Amino acid sequence: MQTIDRLDMLRTSVAALRQGGGTVALVPTMGALHEGHLTLVREAAGRADHVVASIFVNPTQFGPNEDLDAYPRQLAEDCAMLEAEGVALVWAPTVEQMYPEGFASSISVSGVSEGLCGADRPGHFDGVATVVCKLFHQVLPDMAFFGEKDWQQLAVIRVMARDLDLTRPHVAAIRGVATVREEDGLAMSSRNRYLSPEHRQAAAILPRAMKEAIGAIENGAAVAPTLASLEAALLQAGFDSVDYATLADAANLQPLERLAMRPARLLVAARIGGTRLIDNMAVGKV
């Protein structure tokens, strides 16, 4: 497995992988890998001849009061895990490589990026869209894999790829992979390591409360009071605050007051012990 931090070397190495018609899948990450990331790698390996994983802690998607400096960085450990999974190449650029002096461009995806996490983290999805677009242009993958845990991020990336007429990857080849969960149902996240044992135990109420709310909505309960009950359950369990608990259209993320004959998601962001957790689940049978 190669680990590369120069763009010219990346392009040469990817071209070599493509010799003979081999397909290339990209799995973008910020490192601090866990089983959720490795599941993305395995899905990619099952669909492409070669897997390229990127590791880059992207400063432009962190706000001024967020955890950029504290975000875990463990390149050697991450690379060992990726090599064990058969990854062909790790693209680990420096900040200077991605954003050289004079860098002045940004991609903003309106609409789908503006509510939910976008409302609480202004500029976050501009940073996500910009860095992912750069990664797509750098690697030119045939397909790319993202976790469904960050559902809004996945939606933003798909709209960006559609609107910019990207062909590598085409929007249809941007694949979402089901959220990987701990034994108690909590969605795997690099930020879970910030939780104290007490807060980690309390956090397990999040997926349980979401499933209860989904069951109620699917059985005809009114959406607004059901979501209010969900928020109350989280606060009672020890969460500090709930940023949002929303039923939304799965594609455009517009809030829904009732289930319709199209895919929907329940999306929640809540804070416990200073750590912000997000989760989402499908709602309805469509």
UniProtKB/Swiss-Prot annotation:
Cellular localization per UniProt: Cytoplasm
Signal sequence interval, chain numbering: none
Catalytic activity: (R)-pantoate + beta-alanine + ATP = (R)-pantothenate + AMP + diphosphate + H(+)
Keyword Ligase in annotation: yes
A GO BP annotation: pantothenate biosynthetic process
Principal location listed in the UniProt entry: cytoplasm
Binding-site residues, ATP: 30-37, 147-150, 180, 188-191
Domain of life of the source: Bacteria
Gene Ontology molecular function terms on file: ATP binding; pantoate-beta-alanine ligase activity
Binding residue positions for (R)-pantoate: Q61, Q153
EC code: 6.3.2.1
Active site: H37
GO CC term, one of those recorded: cytosol
Keywords: ATP-binding, Cytoplasm, Ligase, Nucleotide-binding, Pantothenate biosynthesis
Pathway: Cofactor biosynthesis; (R)-pantothenate biosynthesis; (R)-pantothenate from (R)-pantoate and beta-alanine: step 1/1
Binding site for beta-alanine: Q61
CDD domains recorded: PanC (cd00560)
Family note: Belongs to the pantothenate synthetase family.
Quaternary structure, from the entry: Homodimer.
Misc. comment: The reaction proceeds by a bi uni uni bi ping pong mechanism.
Purpose: Catalyzes the condensation of pantoate with beta-alanine in an ATP-dependent reaction via a pantoyl-adenylate intermediate.
UniProt protein name: Pantothenate synthetase
Organism whose genome encodes this protein: Erythrobacter litoralis (strain HTCC2594)
